[in-house]
């Protein structure tokens, strides 16, 4: 045991000797580098090299040095500056700074800077000093001063130390603003003193500029102060109006209105009130006002003065000078506006009055005034007939209409070509892009100056007679200038004598302008009546009407002929016979009756059969007899023979045969189809409904019209069957079978119900059928 202890002592002495003995050999710098490199490779040592690579340091020591730098800089250190001071790469500094901030809750890493609580406490003290000095601070000001984010300053500095280091309070309306109670009291005192000194309306902006108080604080403290006045609004142009001034204004306005029953906007504006209408409504909530452009008239003035005077004017059939009953300072424009407003509010019947230059005439007064002019208009009309002036006007008008009709025909042809081109473009566009733009027609509304009362009615009568020049598709069409039988000077000369007695001769021209068109229409109507009363005119009109009627029937026969030629020979023969029996017989009647009238023969019945016509033809002049007999015989022949015979009759009657215009055929076919559709919609009889539907489908499928009776329905359906799908054919077959069923049978009620249900489907098919629908169904 003792030997062991001795051994321990000996070893301790050797160890102490070894420690006290200096090393005889020292490692070189290269050896040290190799040793450290070896340790680093084996990951036995972790060091951080300096930027020049000559020195290295352990991360823990570097972390302590970063904290030392933070302390040396007063609690706020920029990592870039720390990197330069320690000569270490910035990324290493940032990494260690993030670790320091994560491990220590009192240190913050913010925008590349380390900030500790000591620095935050320091800037809180500075903020408190600034708040005490200025009374108010905002986060935006602090952000620019301390170069820190606004959210960090508000949450980690101001709000954290508010009430502790920072002595103040936060604005409830704006949490980014802080102020002291003393500052609020100073602002209250400034506002109270400024408002107490004001005696007239003053702009709020001027007040704020003088007392150096923010607008938000001014409006928030205004209710607490309870000033002797009110602010008009919280807008930029708001004004403060003292109660004493408002009372003075109200007293003046009340006094003026009580004396005059009206208020001028300009006078109210001079009192410092910008919106006069709103002020009047607020000042007199129980009063009714008529607000004009420059004045507001009270209801008492309107009811007791204007309305009563107008009623008296209408009752006495006289006139009224409004300038004598309205306030003298009203201009003529104000008076006109007041009259329009009274009429618009239906206090009086507008048709009873005419307003001219502040004078209101009753309609009865003007009617009596211009009564002599009616006799003059009738005399001028008779004179125009006697002199041939009106006859010349009729001839020129007829020639102009013929020229316009020819121009319209050319325009229609051009429009038809244009429509076809547009249709092709639309189809091409729809095939490529799924649709095209639809053409729109722009309508322009004329802007005419309308006169009051019934003046518009007098000027409206002859609008169609005005000079017009219309341009359409490059063609210029002119209408004959309207014949003016009555001149304005004629009316003025008649009414001026009466107006001079009343001192209203200056209104003779406006009154004449009101009635010029009406009197001219009276004269033209009388002239037309006298013109039509002559036998020569009656004969000419009858000749033109028969000529137009026969030509229309011939065009219809030609179009019907195209349709019936689509059927088999036997059916075609029957359709031709029916066509000539109906339309051909009508043409024969028209021409025979016309010739009988020309030969001064009286005919009791206008609906003649073949035998009656032949008997009547035997009594006619020889120049007509052969042609009419040949026409009646042609009714039993072909359509071509009948047309040739009819042309001979027209030639004998000196009537013009119009040439066939194939370009108008489509419009006639469409019009015929529309008439059939209208009859179909109004039809409730199954047989007639089936007949109309068959004709409509035939026109839609073939593009031709057909004149056929009900017995041809089966033939028509047989012809168009190939263009209908199976459900559509079955529908017509069932309807036809039900129609032919015995109405008195036991199943008549059931048959009627089925007919009613199928009729709607037939009407829908006839209306909406198209060739495209058949191809889709197939």
From Swiss-Prot:
GO terms for molecular function: UFM1 ligase activity. Keywords: Transferase, Ubl conjugation pathway. It holds the Pfam family E3_UFM1_ligase. The keyword Transferase applies. GO terms for cellular component: endoplasmic reticulum membrane. InterPro entries: Ufl1, Ufl1-like_C, Ufl1_dom, Ufl1_N. Residues 404-477 are annotated as: Disordered. Residues 445-457 have a biased composition (Basic residues). One of its GO terms (biological process) is protein K69-linked ufmylation. Its EC number is 2.3.2.-. Belongs to the UFL1 family. E3 UFM1-protein ligase that mediates ufmylation of target proteins. This is E3 UFM1-protein ligase 1 homolog. It comes from Drosophila virilis (Fruit fly).
């Amino acid at each position: 045991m003792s030997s062991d202890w001795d051994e321990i002592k000996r070893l301790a002495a050797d160890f102490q000797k070894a420690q006290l003995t200096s090393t005889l050999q020292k490692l070189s710098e290269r050896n040290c580098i190799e040793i450290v490199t070896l340790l680093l490779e084996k990951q036995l040592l972790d060091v951080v090299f300096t930027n020049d690579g000559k020195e290295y340091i352990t991360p823990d020591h570097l972390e302590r040095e970063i904290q030392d730098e933070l302390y040396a800089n007063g609690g706020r250190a920029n990592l870039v500056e720390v990197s330069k001071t320690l000569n270490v790469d910035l990324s290493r500094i940032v990494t260690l700074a993030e670790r320091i901030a994560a491990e220590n809750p009192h240190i913050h890493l913010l925008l590349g800077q380390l900030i500790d609580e000591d620095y935050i406490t320091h800037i809180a003290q500075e903020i408190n000093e600034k708040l005490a000095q200025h009374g108010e601070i905002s986060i935006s000001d602090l952000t620019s001063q301390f170069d820190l984010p606004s959210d960090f300053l508000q949450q980690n500095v101001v709000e954290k130390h508010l009430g502790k280091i920072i002595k103040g309070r936060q604005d409830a309306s704006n949490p980014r603003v802080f102020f002291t109670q003393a500052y609020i009291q100073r602002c209250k005192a400034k506002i109270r003193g400024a408002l107490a000194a004001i005696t007239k309306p003053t702009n709020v902006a001027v007040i704020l500029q003088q007392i150096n108080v923010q607008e938000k604080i001014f409006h928030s403290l205004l209710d607490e102060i309870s000033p002797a006045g009110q602010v008009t609004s919280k807008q930029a142009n708001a004004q403060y109006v003292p109660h004493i001034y408002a009372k003075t204004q109200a007293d003046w306005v009340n006094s003026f209105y009580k004396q005059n029953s009206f208020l001028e906007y300009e006078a109210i504006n001079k009192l410092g009130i910008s919106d006069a209408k709103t002020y009047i409504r607020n000042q007199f909530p129980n009063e009714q006002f008529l607000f004009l452009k420059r004045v507001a008239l009270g209801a008492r003035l309107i009811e007791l003065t204007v309305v009563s005077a107008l009623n008296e004017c209408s009752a006495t059939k006289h006139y009224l000078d409004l300038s004598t009953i309205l306030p003298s300072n009203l201009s003529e424009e104000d008076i006109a506006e007041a009259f329009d407003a009274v009429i618009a509010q239906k206090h009086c019947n507008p048709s009873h009055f005419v307003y001219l230059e502040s004078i209101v005439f009753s309609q009865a007064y003007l009617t009596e005034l211009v009564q002599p002019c009616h006799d003059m208009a009738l005399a001028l009309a008779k004179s125009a007939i006697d002199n041939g002036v009106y006859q010349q006007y009729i001839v020129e008008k007829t020639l102009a209409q013929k020229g316009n009709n020819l121009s319209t025909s050319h325009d229609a042809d051009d429009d038809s070509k244009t429509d076809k081109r547009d249709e092709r473009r639309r189809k091409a566009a729809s095939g490529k892009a799924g649709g095209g733009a639809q053409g729109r027609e722009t309508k322009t509304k004329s802007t005419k100056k309308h006169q009051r009362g019934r003046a518009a009615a007098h000027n409206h009568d002859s609008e169609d007679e005005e000079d017009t020049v219309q341009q359409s598709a490059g063609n210029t069409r002119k209408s004959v200038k309207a014949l003016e039988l009555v001149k304005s000077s004629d009316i003025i000369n008649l009414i001026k004598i009466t107006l001079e007695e009343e001192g209203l001769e200056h209104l003779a021209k406006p009154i004449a302008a009101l009635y010029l068109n009406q009197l001219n229409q009276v004269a033209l109507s009388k002239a037309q009546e006298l013109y039509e009363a002559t036998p020569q005119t009656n004969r000419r009109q009858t000749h033109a009407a028969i000529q137009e009627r026969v030509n229309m029937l011939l065009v219809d026969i030609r179009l019907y002929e195209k349709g019936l030629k689509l059927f088999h020979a036997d059916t075609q023969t029957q359709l031709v016979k029916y066509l000539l029996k109906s339309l051909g017989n009508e043409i024969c009647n028209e021409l025979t009756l016309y010739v009988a009238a020309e030969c001064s023969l009286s005919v009791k019945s206008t609906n003649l059969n073949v035998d009656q016509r032949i008997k009547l033809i035997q009594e006619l002049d020889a120049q007509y007899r052969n042609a009419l007999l040949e026409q009646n015989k042609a009714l039993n022949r072909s359509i071509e023979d009948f047309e040739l015979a009819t042309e001979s009759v027209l030639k004998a009657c000196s009537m013009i045969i119009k040439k066939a215009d194939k370009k108008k055929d489509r419009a006639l076919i469409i019009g015929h189809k529309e008439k059939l559709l209208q009859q179909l919609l109004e039809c409730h009889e199954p047989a007639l409904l089936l007949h109309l539907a068959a004709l409509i489908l035939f026109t839609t499928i073939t593009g031709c019209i057909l004149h056929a009776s009900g017995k041809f329905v089966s033939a028509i359906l047989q012809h168009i069957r190939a263009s209908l799908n199976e459900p559509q054919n079955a529908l017509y077959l069932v309807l036809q079978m039900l129609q032919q069923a015995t109405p008195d049978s036991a199943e008549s009620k059931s048959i009627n119900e089925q007919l009613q249900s199928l009729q709607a489907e037939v009407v829908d098919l006839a209306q909406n059928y198209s060739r495209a629908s058949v191809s889709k169904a197939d």
